Each structure stands twice: as C-alpha cells, then as structure tokens.
Amino acid sequence: AVDKSKLATDIELALRDVLFNFSKATVRPESYSKLDLAAQIIKSSQGGTYLLIGHTDKKGTDAYNLALSRARAAEVVKELEKRGVDPSQIKSKGMGEAEAKVAETASDEERLQDRKVQVKYVLDSEWDSIPKNDIPTKLIIKK
C-alpha cells in the first residue's frame, strides 16, 4: 500500500520552492517544473486526498495575509488541476500569517521561508467536511 502521509511530504517538498511575487497570487513561471513534479506525485498516488495550506510572511495586516494565503493555495490547486490532477483529490485553505516565524522587519529573503504551501493528507472521513477552497465569493484579489 502507498503511504499517503509520506506522499503528502513528497508533494510538499516538490512545492516548497513554488514562488509568488510579493503580494500576488500568481505562480511565477520558474516554479512550473515544481508544479509538474507535484502533479506527477499526486497522479501516481492511487487516490488519496490532499489539503494544500497556504501561508504568508508577517508583512501586512492579518486580514490581508489571510486572503492572500487563501488565494495562493487555491491558485496552486488550479495549476495542479491544469496538469491533470483529479479535482476531487485536492482542496485548498489559507492560514495567513498565523504560523509565520520570521519577524516582519526581516529581509525579504529571510521572510521567504514563511511564504509557502503545506500539504496534508486527509482521511476520507474528514474530506467531505472541507470546502474546495476558503475564498469568500465577493473578495477580489489582484492577479
């Protein structure tokens, strides 16, 4: 049997260096190969449902960062679906800066480690209670 938690870690590692421009939700082109790899891992996982959790650094307001992290995680899901991942296998959620560790005053390069997407394997019993994404319908984020 395939260890889905281990696969979640592999997917997360593949997505570790997916880069976004500051304050934007669009994935930068140099990150496309990482998305290709993550998509391959998910497609070979023989089922398995994965929650992609977006995180931001501490710069900006809590509310703004929460919205941005939601948009970024949803964008990664969209990019993976474009690469053939079954939409029923992936969902997204944003955490904003809740788990950011680097100070707001640190350099952009230092804060980069807080801007990431985490991947969690979710059991079927829990999966149905999680929405596809947590983006409020009225909110518009710059692309």
Regions found by a protein language model. Give the residues of each.
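Short leucine-rich amphipathic alpha-helices used at interfaces
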Residues: 3-4, 9, 60-61, 67, ...
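Short, surface-exposed beta-strand segments enriched in small/polar/acidic residues
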Residues: 12-23, 35-73, 79, 87-104
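Periplasmic OmpA/Pal-like peptidoglycan-binding modules at the C-termini of bacterial envelope proteins
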Residues: 48, 74, 78-143
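Periplasmic peptidoglycan-binding/tethering modules of Gram-negative envelope proteins
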Residues: 1-49, 108-109, 122-143
